[in-house]
């Protein structure tokens, strides 16, 4: 297999773990990474250990607001902020453009940015296409409606030579694929239920984008209102749930992707789960249940479970990097 030089956009919880995960993949070499305020580039390969150590507990803003800063600051430890704390990095006000400027050296890009505006990820893809990038873009986006926005750019992406792999994490991603396989026992699908459990003892501080995006799925919230929440307000929501938040009927793109694969109608797919921000142990087992009718008239349910010891980071980044290599 050919060696793949890749970049990571976003060094929050998902981005950091992707860099760490890649260290065990000899064929993957991270050569660039950025957050809102800094960019690190080394065509020979980033020193991942140094970058992770420098940014530990110093993760860039997720795009929401803070009471003190109005949205421009990030959590600070010492004089430097986020990626800039690394000796490999430089401060910048145009991090994505700086990565795009290196596109000739980059085979693939993992987009690990919070999708707190519906068209944000599609717009990022468009910017790579406009720059003449030829390669792979992999995203772990969640929202169903974003798939259609990417469709609107399909011709442009193809003409540029970009392969865009969307929904490449756990849900959508790994669990969507499991549902598609489990569905093969049936000639007609009645229901697909995806129920996930995630434990993140590191809490909101180190998983800001993930938590903020999930809060947007709660009753009385949406992308716009979740984006407007301050860090303190999100902490209050977490505290009000004693650190354990349950989600139902989430707008995850598993529904659209399964419909496009000819598995079932999007309306027959439900996604929900439980997020524990006080413990690393999963609060519930991640499960996929596919109910359908077999060719001989029986109605049954195939069930697929993830082991409770496989973390969210492993189940998101493993598939994402796998798709990145395969594409």
Task: Map each language-model feature to its residues.
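A contiguous active-site-proximal alpha/beta segment in oxidoreductase catalytic domains
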Residues: 146-207
């Amino acid at each position: 297999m050919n060696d793949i030089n890749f970049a990571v956009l976003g060094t929050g919880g998902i981005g950091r773990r992707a860099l760490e995960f890649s260290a065990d993949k000899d064929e993957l070499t991270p050569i660039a990474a950025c957050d809102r305020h800094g960019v690190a580039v080394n065509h020979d390969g980033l020193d991942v250990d140094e970058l992770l150590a420098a940014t530990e507990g110093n993760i860039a803003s997720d795009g929401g607001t803070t009471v003190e800063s109005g949205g421009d600051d990030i959590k600070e430890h010492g004089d430097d902020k986020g990626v800039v704390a690394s000796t490999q990095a430089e401060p910048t006000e145009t991090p994505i453009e700086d990565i795009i400027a290196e596109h000739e050296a980059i085979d693939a890009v993992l987009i690990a940015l919070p999708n707190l505006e519906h068209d944000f990820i599609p717009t990022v893809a468009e910017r790579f296409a406009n720059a003449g990038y030829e390669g792979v873009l992999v995203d772990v986006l969640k929202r169903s409606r974003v798939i259609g926005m990417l469709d609107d750019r399909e011709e442009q992406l193809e003409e540029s030579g970009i392969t865009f792999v969307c929904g490449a994490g756990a849900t959508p991603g790994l669990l969507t694929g499991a549902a598609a396989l489990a569905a093969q026992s049936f000639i007609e699908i009645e229901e697909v239920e995806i129920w996930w459990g995630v434990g993140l003892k590191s809490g909101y501080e180190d998983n800001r984008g993930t938590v903020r995006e999930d809060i947007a799925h709660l009753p009385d919230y949406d992308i716009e209102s979740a984006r407007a929440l301050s860090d303190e307000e999100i902490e209050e929501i977490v505290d009000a749930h004693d650190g354990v938040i349950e989600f139902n009927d989430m707008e995850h793109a598993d529904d659209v992707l399964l419909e496009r694969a000819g598995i079932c109608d999007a309306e027959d797919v439900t996604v929900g789960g439980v997020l524990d921000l006080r413990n690393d142990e999963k609060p519930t087992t991640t499960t996929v249940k596919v109910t359908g009718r077999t060719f001989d008239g029986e109605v049954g349910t195939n069930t697929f479970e993830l082991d409770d010891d496989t973390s969210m980071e492993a189940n998101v980044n493993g598939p994402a990097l796998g798709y990145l290599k395969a594409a």
